[in-house]
Amino acid sequence: MSEQVGQREAVDSPQATGVKTPPEPCPLCRETGPPQPPSITEEGKTNEDIDFIWVACNKCDEWYHSACLFLGDEKWRGTIPKEIISTVETNFGDEGAWTNWVEWIGKWYCAPCLARSTSPSNPRPPRHPLVATMKRASIQPKDIDQAGKPLKRSASTSAPLLKSNIKRPRTSTKGQETASPEIDMKSEREQQAESTAGTPASDAPQGRPKRKTAQIDYRNLNNSIATPTHQWLELIADPEKYGRTILDANYPALPGKLLTRAWLESQPLPGQPSSISPDLLPTRFWGPDREPLIVRPENGGFSSLGGHLPSKDLTVQDVANLVGPDRMVDVIDVSSQHSSQWTLQKWAEYIQSSSGNTSVRNPKVYNVISLEISGTELAKKVKPPKIVREIDWVDNFWRFSAGAGGKDVKEKGRGNDSRESSEIRKEGSHLTEGDNAGGEIEEDLEGLKEKTNTPYPKVQLYCLMGMKGAWTDWHVDFAASSVYYTIHSGAKVKLSCFVSFFSPGSYHSQVFFFVKPTEQNLKAYAEWSGSYEKQQDTWLGDMVDEVRKVELHAGDTMIIPTGYIHAVYTPMDSIVFGGNFLHSYNVDTQLRLRQIEIDTKVPQRFRFPMFDRLCWYVADKYCSDLRHLRAYRPRATTTPKPPHFRVLQCLSYLANFLVSQTGILEDPEAEDKARKLVHDRIPGDIVKDPEGLAKELKWRVERELGALGLLGEEASGVEAEEFKSNGTANGSVKIKGKEVSRKRDRLSKVFDKKAISRTWDFHPPAWSENRQSPQIETTTVQLPRPSTSSSDAISGSGPGASPGASANGGANENEQAELTTMLVKQTRKRMRELDDGTVIEESQETTFVEKKTVWGPKLDKEKISQPQGKVEEDMDIDH
């Protein structure tokens, strides 16, 4: 192939042949070649004299003639923005297709890519619809003048490539172009050198300037920057100017020592008295009115939470050294919202050059929000708060495999038991940084994480580094996971020549904007996040009930509860440590956000990693605990306590979710892709019988809730013997054939049984009826005579039709007729008294009206009448 291309290049070269080479066709060209402008025959030109402009699809990189697009059918012409089409036709007429209107295009997509993006068969549709865009909001007069100028052809015969065979890509720069696929391309450096040597400066190719168009940043959807930043910064700076209201949150600060799992589970059962102060209720974290928890330095700071941070003189260069200078990290350009990968060393050097100690600060504002540091030297200097470690699903339920010579999965599961029990024994005490209690257990867990040879969700340790002016748009953390967030204290200038990330005495803060996760607000967020247009031009605060603002300073720590919608503004350079965690106190919201992510087509790689698999681990562990809770212990001196009622309520949601997942596996009408997806996310090494585990968990949870009086008696009265017919969670009972089907049918009836109403034996008192005698009134009226045919009666002719209507569509004269109206009223009433003295009276009233109109041949002489008694007899209606 390379030899053929080289031969063609030699033959086509003007140096070799002295003849013109026909232009390269595009996929839309006709068999006769590219389209010719109307003036080509008048001026005596040929097709080889025309410089065809090329445009590439931003999705598939396929190249097309701009003229072929403009002159194509509606499918292809419709890919061009309408404003461009109207401007070209208005200013250039028939010659417009050959003008350089491509210069006005920002992003463009070909028809096949547009069709595929909306096709139901596309397994991975785009997050937002593909739409062609323009460089500017409107086309300026200078743009029109520039587009009408002809592209000059080089007069030099030493040009290495014919200009007619050169594509002008949408990202090409002046003096650099990309040859067509049929020409053997030299290296970029050689081509630039030859172009400089052989092409006059005045004849240099006029390509489009290179630019990076603003795009949605999917790499960091958890903290995405998906909208134009500048307008939101202006809005939050002066909300009143734009007619908006942002309230101060004024969330009360809490003492750090209070935040433990024991505090979360100190809420008594509904209806029972509580001795907890209203400001310290644990429902502030997991209740319907939950709100962010803030711990200030005066309340004990991060250390009082049982956490640990690096020393205060930590710099970005230190972060790079501890994590690895060559570690790649996603760096977000806040202004263009474009994400690119840098090494940490490059990031540290950029921050150093942008420090307040330098004379000139870099104008570009960047943000790093996705640096996960697990398994690094920096991770050894960071410990999450105790409450996070106590309730985090990953730490407490994930099955880590240590590999050869290490603990197996079952031993890790027993390690969970011992770790949790030891934490429960110490729940009344607080661990300071110097305490070693429980240290061996935590070290074992960290050792398992380091030695594991299987992936696990690494979301608990993040280092975030933001420059002044950074903005993180509205988002809910993946799977509605909770977040702990602490601002590292300001660094001092080192004695060495290195310039610190922070200038001395700088004021470090973060401003959070919160929207409460109510049902309506979550619906509004789902609508906003699922619409590219609304993310671009709609302030989410306009779609929700209210927006509240919280400002954090260096040393402050905040724990954001499940499902909170929030945005973040960084007014000063900052280093932040934080992480995400799932827990058992808001499972319903976590599952709800999982569904929102599916509905809004969030790519799987931007959701909580291995979420479904983690749910199965949680279900297996809790089901085992509930099974042991009811086990007979002949030598036991104490009785184990069931999980907190809030945990049981949330486990009910989890069980229903897992039952629905197994339902997909059992559904023969479900798509194979959906069934395989569910199957692959079940940890088969632990969960041998997914359906049995899900239903057993549902049954055991409902039994415990019933014992606490939080469920109907029927729901908690399912006998264990009935459940055992389906086997244990490990599938120890194996039954084949019809017996399995028969027992499953019986089980489904048990679990699908509806609770009987508490008023099933209630007999209300009888009604006392009062029926009035019919009231009959006869009057003489003037109405047109209706048609007696059935078709006309159906079409509306008759007394109810418009006056003057007749069978033939004409107008009849009014005739005298007799109208008889009968009115019947019936009322009934009943009254009962409850045990507490409440009296309830119910009444009903029914009115029946019947009308009859009679036309006669001689109404003016002979009155058509009927004895009143007979009419009443015929019309009497028995209710």
UniProtKB/Swiss-Prot annotation:
Substrate binds at T472, K492. Gene3D superfamilies: Cupin, Zinc/RING finger domain, C3HC4 (zinc finger). It comes from the Eukaryota. Binds 1 Fe(2+) ion per subunit. Residues 1-45, 117-212, 407-449, 763-879 are annotated as: Disordered. Residues 416-598 form the JmjC domain. GO terms for molecular function: histone H3K36me/H3K36me2 demethylase activity; zinc ion binding. Its main location: nucleus. GO terms for cellular component: nucleus. A zinc finger (PHD-type) spans 23-116. Residues 786-818 have a biased composition (Low complexity). PANTHER family: PHD/F-BOX CONTAINING PROTEIN. Histone demethylase that specifically demethylates 'Lys-36' of histone H3, thereby playing a central role in histone code. Belongs to the JHDM1 histone demethylase family. This is JmjC domain-containing histone demethylation protein 1. The gene is JHD1.
